[in-house]
Amino acid sequence: MDILKKSLFLVLFLGLISLSFCEEEKRENEDEEEQEDDEQSEEKRGLWKSLLKNVGKAAGKAALNAVTDMVNQGEQ
């Protein structure tokens, strides 16, 4: 009976160790995925920022050209 108890405890102990390693790897994988998601979000924000900046520049130039044309037409 003692041999069975010791064997059972050994199996349970090794199972718990294996389970803890699996959980640790799972957490590490989740952290890596989370970091990748954060990096992708930052890239998207950067793209939107540069896009809006370029649109703003183009709109400003177009407005300036329109005002300049109106002023030039008024002087003629």
From Swiss-Prot:
Propeptide feature: residues:
23-45, 75-76
| Residues that bear Glutamine amide | 73
- GO CC annotations, alphabetized: extracellular region
Q: Matching InterPro entries, A to Z?
A: Dermaseptin_dom, Frog_antimicrobial_propeptide, FSAP
Q: Which GO terms describe its biological process?
A: innate immune response
The answer to whether the entry has keyword Signal is yes
Q: Which residues form the signal peptide?
A: 1-22
Amino acid composition bias (Acidic residues), ranges on this chain = 30-41
Q: Where is this region: Disordered?
A: 25-45
User: Which organs or tissues contain this protein?
Assistant: Expressed by the skin glands.
Where is it located? Answer: Secreted
Q: Which UniProt keywords apply?
A: Amidation, Amphibian defense peptide, Antimicrobial, Cleavage on pair of basic residues, Immunity, Innate immunity, Secreted, Signal
- Please give the family membership noted in the entry: Belongs to the frog skin active peptide (FSAP) family. Dermaseptin subfamily.
Functionally, this protein is described as follows: Antimicrobial peptide.
Instruction: Quote the protein name from its UniProt record.
Output: Dermaseptin-S7
Native species: Phyllomedusa sauvagei (Sauvage's leaf frog)
